[in-house]
């Protein structure tokens, strides 16, 4: 069955004599795995021969055949109860299927074999992810999820890629929150490419909450060593050196650097602050684009829009809890008011001023907000 499937996936990329030679060798190795009376099959030897055949086929650019041989290697490793070997073989098979799909799209401009290699790659990588999780390797599982998501995004399937990015973020979150936030950002970008603006808004909201939780922890100051009591030294005959004044006095510490004190963080630390800025701007633009009715406006979204109303303006050009630069905050505040008043000309002028301050993704959202203001659709663009 596997040989027949491999023949169907080959698509005539192999001359007839060489294809027959491959099938003969594949069947010859497969026959060694059949159970016989009073004879135990040598699974390890068969796995090595399948791996050797896969290397030869890969060198000859026969990618689907090599991938099916790697799947046979994975079955042999499973029979030997060798989880790492099985996961490695499944990963190699998936990469070969993905390479076949990319080559077909580059050469022919269409999916290979009606998208079957892409489905086979997703299935193999999914099995490898489950194995890594069973082995207690969430980082390796997350890396495979990111690899599959990037491949799906590259072949023009951003909606499917977003789910794998979110799964990678879930696996990264306990140990590497910054990597999890980056994966969530990629998921939100994929949802924007797929025009799932409601889903992107939910992801940005979650990103902002996680960035505040993991990026605003105070830093514990190290304990200073306590001074030991001075022991009187026996006096020696002869002149003694004069002690230096102040050499034994402890240096005064600032109030916020006392031993064992907790330094209060002025805000979100490091790269988490950049994540907060991106999420805040993107959420405001998405809310202006979607324009949800008050009955369907979630409390966290209502609080976001309230921060940019004139009533919430504190006179310093920034809200008390925000991380935005003052200029960007004032421009966003003006944009919210202009969108509320349906001021098309005002939005156009603000677009010119905000263009250098936003990313390409955010500038596209701002353009959609302008188009929605000019031609309202009732459900966003």
From Swiss-Prot:
Q: Where in the cell is it found?
A: Cytoplasm; Nucleus; Early endosome; Nucleus, Nuclear body
Modified residue annotations for N-acetylalanine? 2
Keywords linked to the UniProt accession: Acetylation, Cytoplasm, Endosome, Nucleus
**Region (Disordered) residue spans:** 213-260
Keyword match Secreted: no
What is the residue range of the motif Nuclear localization signal?
A: 34-36
For bias kind Low complexity, which ranges apply? 218-230
What GO cellular component is one of the record's annotations? nuclear body
Name the domain of life: Eukaryota
Q: One of this protein's GO BP terms?
A: vesicle cytoskeletal trafficking
Pro residues bias spans: 231-242
User: Chief location of this protein?
Assistant: cytoplasm
PANTHER family for the chain: 40-KDA HUNTINGTIN-ASSOCIATED PROTEIN, FACTOR VIII-ASSOCIATED GENE 1
Relate the protein's function as given in its record: RAB5A effector molecule that is involved in vesicular trafficking of early endosomes. Mediates the recruitment of HTT by RAB5A onto early endosomes. The HTT-F8A1/F8A2/F8A3-RAB5A complex stimulates early endosomal interaction with actin filaments and inhibits interaction with microtubules, leading to the reduction of endosome motility.
Q: Self-association or partners: how does it assemble?
A: Interacts with HTT (via C-terminus). Interacts with RAB5A. Found in a complex with F8A1/F8A2/F8A3, HTT and RAB5A; mediates the recruitment of HTT by RAB5A onto early endosomes.
Its name, as the record gives it, is 40-kDa huntingtin-associated protein
Q: Say which species the protein is native to.
A: Rattus norvegicus
| Gene that specifies this protein | F8a1
């Amino acid at each position: 069955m596997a040989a027949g499937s491999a023949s169907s996936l080959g698509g005539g990329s192999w001359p007839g004599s060489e294809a027959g030679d491959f099938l003969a060798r594949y069947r010859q190795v497969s026959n060694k795995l059949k159970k016989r009376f009073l004879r135990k099959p040598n699974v390890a030897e068969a796995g090595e021969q399948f791996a050797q055949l896969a290397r030869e086929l890969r060198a000859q650019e026969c990618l689907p055949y090599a991938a099916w041989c790697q799947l046979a290697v994975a079955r042999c490793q499973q029979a030997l109860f060798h989880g790492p070997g099985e996961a490695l073989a499944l990963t190699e098979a998936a990469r070969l299927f993905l390479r076949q799909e990319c080559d077909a799209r580059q050469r022919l401009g269409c999916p290979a074999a009606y998208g079957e290699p892409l489905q086979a790659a997703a299935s193999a990588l999914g099995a490898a992810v489950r194995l890594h999780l069973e082995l207690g390797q969430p980082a390796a599982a997350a890396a495979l999820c990111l690899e599959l998501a990037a491949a799906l995004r590259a072949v023009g399937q951003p909606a499917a890629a977003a789910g794998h990015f979110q799964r990678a973020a879930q696996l990264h979150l306990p140990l590497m929150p910054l990597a999890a936030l980056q994966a969530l950002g990629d998921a939100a970008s994929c949802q924007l490419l797929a025009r799932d603006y409601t889903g992107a808004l939910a992801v940005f909201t979650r990103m902002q909450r996680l960035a505040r939780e993991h990026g605003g922890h105070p830093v514990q100051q190290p304990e200073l060593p306590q001074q030991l009591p001075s022991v009187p030294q026996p006096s020696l005959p002869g002149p003694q050196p004069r002690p230096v004044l102040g050499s034994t006095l402890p240096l005064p510490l600032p109030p916020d650097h006392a031993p064992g004190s907790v330094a209060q963080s002025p805000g979100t630390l490091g790269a988490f602050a950049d994540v907060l800025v991106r999420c805040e701007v993107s959420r405001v633009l998405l809310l202006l684009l979607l324009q949800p009715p008050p009955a369907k406006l979630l409390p966290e979204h209502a609080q976001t829009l309230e921060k940019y109303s004139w009533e919430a303006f504190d006179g310093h050009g920034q809200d008390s809890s925000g991380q935005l630069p003052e200029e960007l905050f004032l421009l966003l505040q003006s944009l919210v008011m202009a969108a509320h008043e349906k001021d098309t000309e005002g939005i156009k002028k603000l677009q010119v001023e905000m263009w250098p301050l936003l990313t390409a993704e955010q500038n596209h959202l701002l353009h959609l907000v302008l188009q929605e203001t000019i031609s309202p659709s009732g459900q966003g663009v």
